[in-house]
C-alpha cells in the first residue's frame, strides 16, 4: 500500500500565518498553502505591496488576508497577531515565520527581547 502523503499532509481548511509574504520565498509558501485550500493571513512591512498580493489572491478565489506592520517591534507584533487571530477565528494551524529582519549585534550584546 502506497503512503498517501496528500491526505496526511493536507492543509485544506487550515488556518495559517506567513510573515514576509509580500514577495520572495515567503510569498511562494503562502501561495502554496492557498492553492491547497488553506486560509492565510499574509504579513509584511510593505503595506501597499502586501495588500496588492492579498487582493490578487482573493480575485483568484483564495482566502487571503493582509496584515501589515513591523515585526521587529514588540507592540506591532502584538497588534498584528491579535488582528490575525481575530481574522482566523482564534485558530492557528500553521505558522511560517519567514520575514527577514536584520539587526546587527555582537552575539554577547544581543538583547534578550530582540
Tell where the protein language model's regions lie, with residue ranges:
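Conserved glycine-rich Rossmann-like NAD(P)H-binding loop of the short-chain dehydrogenase/reductase
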Residues: 36-53
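Conserved mid-core segment of classical short-chain dehydrogenase/reductases
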Residues: 78, 102-114
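Glycine-rich phosphate-binding loop signature in dinucleotide/nucleotide-binding domains
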Residues: 84-91
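Rossmann-fold scaffold of SDR-type NAD(P)-dependent oxidoreductases
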Residues: 19, 92-100
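Structural signature of beta-strand start/N-cap positions in the alpha/beta core
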Residues: 15, 39, 63-65, 91-93
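Conserved residues in the N-terminal Rossmann fold of short-chain dehydrogenase/reductase
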Residues: 42, 67-68
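Canonical Rossmann dinucleotide-binding motif of NAD(H)/NADP(H)-dependent dehydrogenases/reductases
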Residues: 5-41
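The beta1-alpha1 cofactor-binding region of Rossmann-like NAD(H)/NADP(H)-dependent oxidoreductases
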Residues: 47-48, 68-80, 112
Amino acid at each position: 500500500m502506497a503512503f498517501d502523503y496528500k491526505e496526511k499532509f493536507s492543509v485544506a481548511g487550515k488556518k495559517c500565518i506567513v510573515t514576509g509574504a509580500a514577495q520572495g520565498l515567503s510569498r511562494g509558501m503562502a501561495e502554496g498553502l492557498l492553492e491547497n485550500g488553506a486560509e492565510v493571513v499574509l504579513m509584511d512591512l510593505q503595506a501597499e505591496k502586501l495588500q496588492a498580493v492579498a487582493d490578487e489572491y482573493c480575485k483568484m478565489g483564495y482566502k487571503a488576508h493582509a496584515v501589515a506592520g513591523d515585526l521587529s517591534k514588540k507592540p506591532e507584533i502584538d497588534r498584528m497577531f491579535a488582528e490575525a487571530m481575530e481574522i482566523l477565528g482564534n485558530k492557528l494551524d500553521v505558522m511560517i515565520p519567514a520575514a527577514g529582519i536584520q539587526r546587527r549585534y555582537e552575539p554577547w550584546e544581543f538583547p534578550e527581547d530582540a
